[in-house]
Amino acid sequence: MIQHPRIGIRPTIDGRRQGVRESLEVQTMNMAKSVADLISSTLKYPDGEPVECVISPSTIGRVPEAAASHELFKKSNVCATITVTPCWCYGSETMDMSPDIPHAIWGFNGTERPGAVYLAAVLASHAQKGIPAFGIYGRDVQEASDTAIPEDVKEKLLRYARAALATGLMRDTAYLSMGSVSMGIGGSIVNPDFFQEYLGMRNESVDMTEFTRRMDRGIYDPEEFERALKWVKENVKEGFDHNREDLVLSREEKDRQWEFVIKMFMIGRDLMVGNPRLAELGFEEEAVGHHALVAGFQGQRQWTDHFPNGDFMETFLNTQFDWNGIRKPFVFATENDSLNGVSMLFNYLLTNTPQIFADVRTYWSPEAVERVTGYTLEGRAAAGFLHLINSGSCTLDGTGQATRDGKPVMKPFWELDESEVQAMLENTDFPPANREYFRGGGFSTRFLTKGDMPVTMVRLNLLKGVGPVLQIAEGYTLELPEDVHHTLDNRTDPGWPTTWFAPRLTGKGAFKSVYDVMNNWGANHGAITYGHIGADLITLASMLRIPVNMHNVPEEDIFRPKNWSLFGTEDLESADYRACQLLGPLHK
C-alpha cells in the first residue's frame, strides 16, 4: 500500500544539559505538537483524509538526534520538514540536510530565549550549504508561556505545508500521454527531462489505438458500461446540432457514438489508474494501469478525423462525479498539452478542487464590446475581459453551480452534494461536435460559468536555455447580460463551454491592462482554478526551482526560501530567476 506523503516536524533545542535543555523540553515539544495539530486539523489530501505529520522521536540538540530524526522520516514517507524552536540551538548540527525535499524553520519570537537568533543562524547555514529553507518568524513578541500560534505564523506554516505536500504527491507518479503531439502544439511535445528533474515524475505513453483495441476485445467492465449508458440517457442532455445539414449524423449513428464515448471515458480512466475488475475479467496486465497522476489525450487530428472526439471523456474525467457517484476528479489535459496538464496539477494539489482547461481565446476591449453589442462594460468588466473557451470539453464543476454561503464555488468532492451534481447537469448540454473540426463526430460540452467567482489562471511554459517558467493571473469570472453573452459567444463556437474572465490589474508590467495580460500570456492554453492561490503557487514554484515570470500577487504575500533574499531584495522577479538558475531543479 502506498503511504500518503507526510510532513516531518523537528523540535530543536539548546543542547546544554544541567538546567538549560531540561527547562525547554516541554515548551519545545509542545511547539512541534501544535504545528502538527494545526496542519492535520486544517489540510486534507486529495482523497479527503487529514494530512499526517510525523514528529521527531525526541527534541534535537545534537547531531545524533538529528540523524535519528532523519532515519525516522526516511521510513515514514516524509516529503518536507518543519523545524520549530523557542530558543538557541546549534545551527548546522541540528539542521536537516536532505537536499531533495523542502525545509522550513519557525523560530519563536520571544525575549526569554533567542529563537530568532537560531533561526537566523541556521538559515545562514542552509544558504551556505545550498539547501534552501523557508524562515518563519512571528511579527509580534510572544510570552514564553504562550502556546498559541500567531495568525501570521499560521498563514506561512499552512502555505508552506500545502506547497510541500504538492511536491510529495507528485513524486514517483507518472504523466501518461495518450497519443502524441496534437497539431504541433508545443505543450504536447512532452519533455521527460522536465518531468523527471523538476517534478520527480516519469513519463509513459500509449498509442490511441489502445482505445480501439480495448473496445474491440472487450477490455472494459461490461456491467459498468450498461449502468453508465442508462445513467447518461437519464441525466445527460444532448444539445442542439449546429452542423450544416449534410454533416448531421443519423439518430442511429449518434446513439452508437454515445456508446463509443462512454467506453472512451472508462478506458481513459482505466489507463490512468487501473481497474481491479479487469483482472476478474482475465485482463491482469490492463488492470494495473499506469500510476498516472495526470494524463493527456492527443485527439486532433489523427483520432478526431476518424473517430468521435474525446470531449465527453475529458469532461467527465475532470469532473467530480459520474454514474458511480461523487468522487475526486482526475487531472486530464486536452490535446495532450502536458504543460497545461502540469499547470492544472499544481492548482489541483494546492486546492483539492477540479480544474478548468481553456483556450485563452480572445481579449474583448470595452470599445469592441460596445461596437458589437451596444453595451457599455461596467464593474469588474469595465477594463475588458478574456474569453476562456476550450474546444469542446471542460469540467462540469466549472459551471459554478456548486455553492458555499450562497455564492458559486468549485469545491472539493467531499463537500459536494447530489443537488449540486444535478444543478451542474441541468445547466450543461452536450451538442454533437462541430464536424468541420471533428470529422469523426462526438459530443462537446456547453455551459456558461457563473460570474463573481475568484479564480486564478496559470500556465507553465518551457523556455529554451532557462527551463520551465510559471505565469499567474488572479481575477474573477464575469456574468454578462444574457444578450451580450450570446452575441459574443456565438462569434466563436456556440457548442463549447465559456468562461468570461477579468484579471486583477495592478497598473504595471503585464498587468497594466487586460490587453497586456493577453499579450504576455505564454501559450494558447491556461489552467483555471477556484480561489486566489497565486501566493501558494509562487511558494510551490520556488520549491521546484521554477521562476515566476508574471503574476499579480501582492508583494507582502510572497513567501519563498530565505536565501532568495540573498540574490537581491529590490527586484524580486530577477532574484527569483537567479536563485532558480543557480540551485537547479529539485530532483536533479
UniProtKB/Swiss-Prot annotation:
EC number(s) per entry: 5.3.1.25
Enzyme class: isomerase
Alphabetically ordered keywords of this record: Carbohydrate metabolism, Cytoplasm, Fucose metabolism, Isomerase, Manganese, Metal-binding
Localization annotation: Cytoplasm
Family matches, as SUPFAM superfamilies: FucI/AraA C-terminal domain-like, FucI/AraA N-terminal and middle domains
Keyword flag Hydrolase: no
One of the record's GO molecular function terms: arabinose isomerase activity
Domain of life: Bacteria
Pfam families (UniProt xref): Fucose_iso_C, Fucose_iso_N1, Fucose_iso_N2
A GO term from the CC aspect: cytoplasm
Catalyzed reaction equations: L-fucose = L-fuculose
Cofactor names: Mn(2+)
Binding locations of Mn(2+): 335, 359, 525
GO biological process: D-arabinose catabolic process; L-fucose catabolic process
Active site: 335 (proton acceptor), 359 (proton acceptor)
Pathway: Carbohydrate degradation; L-fucose degradation; L-lactaldehyde and glycerone phosphate from L-fucose: step 1/3
Known role: Converts the aldose L-fucose into the corresponding ketose L-fuculose.
Family in the record: Belongs to the L-fucose isomerase family.
Descriptive protein name: L-fucose isomerase
Lineage of origin: Bacteria, Bacillati, Bacillota, Bacilli, Lactobacillales
